[in-house]
Structure formats: C-alpha cells, structure tokens
Amino acid sequence: MSIATAVSKRINEYLFARGITLYKLAKDSGLPIATLQNLYRGQIKTPTLAVLLKICSGLNISIIEFLDCPYFSSCDLELD
C-alpha cells in the first residue's frame, strides 16, 4: 500500500467514525479544501508532516493516534 493510500484510508476512517465531511475537517484544520480533496483522492503522494499535523489538529487527535494503525506499520508500505 502506498503512503497516499494509507493516509486517504485513515482520513476516511475518522470522517466516517465522526460523521463529518472533508469541508468540516478543512475548516477545523485550517487546510484548504483542495488540499484535503487531493489527499483524500491519493493525488498527493507524500504529504508533509505539517499537513498531517494540521489534519490531526482538526480531528483533535495526536499524530501518534493517526499513525497507529496497520496501514502505517506494514513492512509493505510503498514509498513513492
């Protein structure tokens, strides 16, 4: 799985679990909606730590919580 896919899946999990939209996350994180849409679609291959931290801030979670899932612990994670 690529990093882009892992990030997209993780964002989707949080959006679904909390019943929020990308637009709400954009507002809460301070990121442009276009950036989140591109991440969600996997069009941003290697998101920066700053972007991930803003997403986490918008979700009110730590980066550790965001990355704490099988998607990111897999030895098969592809670096694009």
Predicted feature residues:
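Short, charge-rich amphipathic interface segments used for partner binding and complex assembly
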Residues: 53-57, 65
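Short, charged recognition helix plus adjacent turn
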Residues: 67-80
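DNA major-groove recognition helix of helix-turn-helix
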Residues: 15, 40, 51, 67-70
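Short, basic-rich loop-to-helix N-cap that marks the start of a DNA-contacting helix
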Residues: 43-54
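A short, Lys/Arg-rich alpha-helix, primarily the initiator
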Residues: 1-21
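Short alpha-helical DNA-recognition segment
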Residues: 20-38
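The alpha-helix within a helix-turn-helix
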Residues: 15, 26, 56
